[in-house]
Regions:
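Bacterial N-terminal signal peptides that target proteins for export
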Residues: 1-8
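Secretory/extracellular carbohydrate-interaction modules
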Residues: 21-109, 267-276
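Local beta-strand/beta-hairpin segments that build beta-sheet-rich folds
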Residues: 22, 159-168, 217-219
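Activation corresponds to long, low-complexity, non-globular regions
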Residues: 22-55, 180, 184, 189-277
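Short beta-strand segments enriched in hydrophobic/aromatic residues
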Residues: 45-49, 84, 141-143, 156, ...
Length: 277
């Protein structure tokens, strides 16, 4: 190797290494809510900053999640997913008796199966939500034997009514709602998306305990994913406007370290008006 080639490699190699290590996505950030097992989970999300390829998930639980997305083409949707009891990523390989059942689906809701990160059933409702708009979600759980039916409801402010989107039933061993959480995810993952900020506030969360009493969700623990392709440092969470905020990507600066237990003001004495399940 001649002297000129050696100098060229010395100059270029750090750039190549830097390019290879550049994050492809903003880091997924979560709020985990300490709560008892529940028959209903209500939560609100207000998106302040979004970009194509963003998922703002309001009502997550062991076996499913429910929220809003801005897809890669800019289309806005409401999405609700529930997992099969079977393990694996091939949706077609799951035996019929282990697949999620669709007990109810609104006419303008699309439902189908998914694979790739577990398998199960998911539904999509076209809804052009806006930044600054508070979106409201309710998930209920009804146990019958070893199965649980999870119903997803979304509030339509223009009609001032709740819309029952879908009810999925899956094998749970007879469990109700547990392991409650929210998150923000960058699913575009094209490098540029790591440089773009996503910010939302999750507020006024409530759970209905198995015996029927409603309890506010006033604490949440800050968490984040550990995928190697994500930007690790540009994450944040905290308390603002009576709720919990999550932020990731772009020029985000951390004000509270991971694992911080956040506490919001108690707020209302009871949840807002909800549909009768």
């Amino acid at each position: 190797m001649d002297h000129y080639t050696r100098l060229l490699l010395i100059a270029v190699l750090p750039l190549l290494i830097s390019a290879a290590e550049a994050p492809r996505a903003a880091r997924s950030v979560h709020l985990f809510y300490p709560a008892p097992d529940a028959s209903a989970f209500y939560n609100e999300v207000t998106v302040e900053r979004s970009t194509p390829g963003s998922y703002f998930m309001a009502c997550g639980f062991d076996g499913g999640y429910f929220g809003i997305q801005e897809q890669g083409n800019g289309r806005k949707i409401v999405i609700f997913s529930v997992w099969d009891a079977a393990k694996g990523n091939d949706a077609k390989a799951v035996p019929g008796e282990q697949r999620v059942e669709v007990l109810f689906k609104a006419d303008d809701v699309r439902a189908g199966r998914f694979g790739g990160e577990g398998t199960g059933g998911q539904s999509f409702f076209n809804y052009d939500w806006k930044t600054g708009q508070t979106c409201r979600f309710l998930v209920t759980a009804e146990v019958t034997g070893k199965k649980t039916a999870f119903a997803g409801y979304f509030y339509l402010p223009d009609k001032k009514t709740w819309k029952h989107l879908v009810t999925f039933r899956t094998i749970t061993g007879g469990k109700h709602l547990k392991g409650l959480y929210s998150f923000i995810e960058d699913f575009r993952r094209d490098g540029k998306s790591a440089t773009e900020v996503r910010l939302a506030t999750f507020a006024n969360g409530w759970v209905r305990e198995i015996k029927g009493a409603w309890r506010p969700l006033t604490t949440a623990r800050f968490s984040a994913s550990n995928s190697g392709f994500e930007a690790k440092e540009t994450i944040d969470a905290g308390v603002a406007d009576g709720g919990f905020y999550l932020q990731t990507g772009g020029d985000t600066q951390t004000h509270n370290p991971l694992k911080t237990l956040l506490t919001r003001p108690k707020g209302a004495e009871e949840p807002p008006e909800l549909p009768k399940d």
